[in-house]
Every structure is written in structure tokens, then in C-alpha cells.
Amino acid sequence: FEANLQLKNLYRAEEVETICSCTFLNACQNYPLLIGQQTNLYKCVLENCMEMNNPMGYTGIICPDGIYEDPAGTTFREVLYKKLRFHFQYVNTMKLFSEILHWVTYSTNIIGAYNKDLDFYSINNLYLPQTIDGCLIHDGSGLCGGLKNENGDWNTKAHKKRLIRYDKDKLELLSNVFEEGGTKSCPKLVSIHSQDILDVLKKIEAYPLHVRDFKHIITVCFDETGAPKAGLIKRETHQPNIEYYDMIFNGPHIYVANPLSKTPRKECVVANRDYDTIDLNEISIDYFSRTNYRRLIPTEEYKSYIKGFVEGQDNDGNQIYGNYIDYYKLGFRNMMSQTGERTLICAVLPRKTAHIHGVRSVAFRNGTDTVDMAGLCASIVMDFYMKTIGADNLMPSRMQSFPLGVASKYQSALYSRTLML
């Protein structure tokens, strides 16, 4: 810059423009509905549209669906839902926008005058715009269909049940099922494919007990980056001895109700590819898969590293904790695939085993609660629940909202089936 004054001035001009733009877009007096959010041009333009819309007119905007999914967007949604008339969500699989990736979602939104009563229509999982017209005129006959048709192609067929009319009661349903009732009038707008799904959600809403109502611990055990730096574990593929607390699980090890789904190869380099599927019919009774990690600290220190439940007090009044690693726990894959065969994947992990943060586990004070949750979370009902949410990661708050506590008349069958698997 010292040698080229013109280049310096050009840089300074760009810097001033960028800083001023960011300051303007993040100023609360300019965009009060976006306070507490990560702003972007789409959100700012959407707020401008709501402010400038003529009471007798309508405004249409195409934008990403982030505002409907942002946990910090409750204030924005509370105003938006009162002005929203139509929300049509697309998945770009037909490449209507060739410059963005095929899995990106976006929506067309029609905004009108402020309406004190919530009342708008929504269609999700659209691939072509002509499906909208068909849904509006359909007579309701026949089956609605899913995301794909019987030939495995993306379903562009219209059906009356694809059209969801949202009012105060339906938004409260979403709030109760997915957000513990904390945002009655402005919950996140999850992807509801058809009206039939709302009936299923009503059943889930009516479930009386949840994980949060039971004594439990949720943990990731060891962070894949932090734990090696702290000298707790190291990356090394080897055959573990469970009795010596050698087994450390990661995501690919487990599948639905199966902690022995895959084993890493002796040379495991590529995270999700260097694994072989385990044939459960061929392995011996004492077989166990390899692990990619080796513990570096003494057994007693390792066992007590993650605190369990309080078991009493010592002579000085200090609390005595159990060892979490010594519990049976239910391990979940932390990363969830919304397009895979199953989204919610979990299995009961044996005592004396741990895992890295690619797995998130829960243990209960009462061991039967662990079996209860294992059975429920292996079901297609809970898998449907997570697919409806559309989340890519399983967070503790979401796990705490899972239904739990099966009626006694079903327990015997559920427990025997779950433990047999």
C-alpha cells in the first residue's frame, strides 16, 4: 500500500463500504425484528417487505427457509405469521436454480396485511411449482404419496392433503411436540408433508411423560479433538478388551438396536469408509469390533473421569458419584441423515465402554428406563419424529423431549424384544 497509493485508497473504500453495510444491517433501530439473530440480506429484505406492504396489497418473496428454523427467530416469526398468507417450500432436486446445490431448500412466501388471527397455508417438499395449483384444486381422492413415487422418482403429484392450513391450534401443536410448549404462537415451522402427519403429531403430543421427567445423564464422553490434546485418549485402531475398559465407540459402530453394526479396518484412515459390516450370524459369542481409540490414563482415573449419579456422601459430607462408564447407556449417532434409510440411530452400549462425541449417550438411574427408551427410539415412530424436525444433529434438549414411559401392559413384550435385539 505504501508503494501504491491508488491501491491503498481502493482497499480503504471497500473496507469502509463493507463495515458500514454490516453496521447498518445489524442495527437494531433499522431491523428490530432481527435482534439476537445472525442477520443476512434475505432476512432484512423480508422485514422491509412486511413494513412497506400496502394493507390492501400482497408481496411475494423467494428466500431461504432459515427464518422458519432459527431458534432465535421467535420475535420475527411472531410478526411474520400474522402477515403470512402462503408458504411454499421447495427442495432444489429438479435444479430450478442451477447455481445452487440440489439439496438446498428455499420457499416462496406471500405476505399480506396484518391479521390478528393466525391463518396461512403451507405446502412442503415441492419440486415443481405446478404441484401448487394441483393441490389447490384437488378433490382429496386417492393416496397422498410420499417424497418419491413408486418408481423411485421425486413425487411431483398434487393432492389436497399436501395443503396444510395453519391456525393458532396447529402452531400450538408444533410448539408442544417439538419445543416443549415454549413458543405457542411462533414455533419453528417444521416440514409437514401431509395432513395425515398432523394426526400422528397429536398422538405424540398426548404422551404424558418424557425423558426430562426421569433422572438421567446425557454426555458425549470424550471430544475427538480435545481428549487427545488433554492426554486422555489417542487415535489408534486396535482390538479392545472390554473388561479392561478398552472399547471406545464412534458413530459408524452402531445402527438401529445394534452396537455391532460395523468394525473399522486395521488401517482406518477415511472416517466413514474404512469400515466393514459385521455379519451377526458368523461372529462368535465373545466377538467385539475394533476401536479407533486407545485410552492413555490409568483404569481408575479413566472410570471416574465422567461422573455418574450421586450415590451418597463421605465422612466430610462430600458427594460420592458413581462412574458413568460403568453404566449401561443408550448411544445415539450425533449426526443424523435426513435422506438415509433411518435418521434416528441408537443402540444399547455395554458397561465398561465409552465413546467420542460422534455418539451422544444417555443413562438413567433406573436401568429399565434405558431399555424403555431403547425400544421407543428404535421404532419408526421416533424416526418419523426426527425426520419431521429435519435436524442434522441430535442435541441434549431434543433428547430430553423424547416420549418415555411405556404402559405396563406393553412393557414385557417391548423389553424382551429390545434386549433380544
Language model region names:
Residues F1-L421:
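S-adenosyl-L-methionine
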